[in-house]
Swiss-Prot record:
Residue span(s) of domain BTB: 200-267
Species in which this protein is naturally found: Danio rerio
SUPFAM superfamilies: POZ domain (SSF54695), TRAF domain-like (SSF49599)
One of the record's GO cellular component terms: nucleus
Record's subcellular location: Nucleus
Name this protein carries in UniProt: Speckle-type POZ protein-like A
An example Gene Ontology biological process: protein ubiquitination
TM region positions: none
Length: 392
């Protein structure tokens, strides 16, 4: 989704004519995508005009505008009987109408987009109205195995939607003598203070290594350090903190984040850094670690990641790990190869990994949570046919 509109930068306003007042109009556009896989496509409805519908989808959980895809496997009418027809349908909408552009494509055996067709303009949708292509792709071309569009008899459709939202205006007065304000260097300055150990007033000992720091900065950034130095604790009296459950390289990365808000080596140590961030109540760093771990989920590590998320109350990571497990389970039932890398050539079962077997023994409640989520997951539904199928 496009963000809050900003006025034109000074460079644009100072080149060429400059007016005393100006207005900047931002047309907001919400973009989202949807993937629909139809298993055993060759068994789909064979009569012209018969329809198959996807489940409903939207741009996000808070979006009340619901869409679905509608496909006619053997065309919509006599003109398109040798084609597959594909449409985008507005199922429900809180507004009287909405304008949207769309793009359809097929995913081939290599999971690459092909045979893309895009609307040339933003069409006007009202509830129950659909737009699309009567002649999206010829059936004989689609069914030809040499073209690789139905791997394992699965048709995968990919749809990208761009919904036009309300426009926003920002206006103001021009300043003929604009000054360029230098970028803030606070992060770099504090980083240098940490790297050079200047004006430090406390020492932190981790794994036999000493790290000199500034109590005021530690207290300002971490509620845990704040409590440690604020009260008459041993660390506050001696200006010394002994830390035994964090590796030195992980601690150094955490301290760099405390001073600069950056963690350049986060990807290499996201699991250990998440534990340290949780211990010292560094919420932003914790979520950054969750994001990195979400992006690296795999069949082999998802069980260990789920345990880590549960141990450190990383709720977003926990939800993503459970969702990954469930998607793998559903896709395996449908005959897909691998839950995350759908184009993988090997069918690895999460439940056969050492991490999963260990989790059954040490954290059985997580196994129960994963299965409860799987049981409550919604499955795609098919639309009713317009005609009865011929019986063979």
């Amino acid at each position: 989704m496009s963000g809050v509109p900003t006025p034109p930068p000074p460079g644009e306003m100072s080149s060429g004519p400059v007016a005393e007042s100006w207005c900047y109009t931002q047309v907001k556009v919400v973009k989202f995508s949807y993937m629909w896989t139809i298993n055993n496509f060759s068994f789909c409805r064979e009569e012209m005009g018969e329809v198959l519908k996807s489940s409903t989808f939207s741009s996000g959980p808070n979006d009340k505008m619901k869409w679905c895809l509608r496909v006619n496997p053997k065309g919509l009418d006599d003109e398109s009987k040798d084609y597959l027809s594909l449409y985008l349908l507005l199922v429900s909408c809180p507004k009287s109408e909405v304008r949207a552009k769309f793009k359809f494509s097929l995913l081939n055996a290599k999971r690459e987009e092909t045979k893309a067709m895009e609307s040339q303009r933003a069409y006007r949708f009202v509830q129950g109205k659909d737009w699309g292509f009567k002649k999206f792709i010829r059936r004989d071309f689609l069914l030809d195995e040499a073209n690789g569009l139905l791997p394992d008899d699965k048709l995968t459709l990919f749809c990208e939607v761009s919904v036009v939202q309300d426009s926003v205006n920002i206006s103001g007065q021009s300043n003929m003598n604009m000054l360029k304000v230098p970028e803030c260097q606070l992060s770099d300055d504090l980083g240098n203070l940490w790297e050079c150990s200047r004006f430090t007033d406390c020492s932190l000992y981790v794994g036999g290594q000493e790290f000199k720091a500034h109590k005021s900065i530690l207290a300002a950034r971490s509620p845990v350090f704040n409590a440690m130095f604020e009260h008459e604790m041993e660390e506050s009296k001696k200006n010394r903190v002994d830390i035994s459950d964090v590796e030195p390289e992980v601690f150094k990365e955490m301290m760099g984040f405390i001073y600069t808000g950056k963690a350049p080596n986060l990807e290499k140590m996201a699991d250990s850094l998440l534990a340290a961030a949780d211990k010292y109540a560094l919420e932003r760093l914790k979520v950054m670690c969750e994001e990195a771990l979400c992006n690296s989920l795999s069949v082999e590590n998802v069980a260990d990641t789920l345990i880590l998320a549960d141990l450190h109350s990383a709720e977003q990571l926990k939800a993503q790990a459970i969702d990954f497990i469930n998607r793998c389970s559903v896709l395996r039932q449908l005959g897909c190869k691998d839950g995350k890398n759908w184009n993988s050539n090997h069918a690895t079962d999460i439940m056969e990994t050492a991490g999963w077997k260990s989790m059954i023994q040490s954290h059985p409640h997580l196994v129960a949570e994963a299965f409860r989520a799987l049981a409550s997951a919604q499955c795609p539904h098919f639309g009713l046919p317009r005609k009865r199928l011929k019986q063979s």
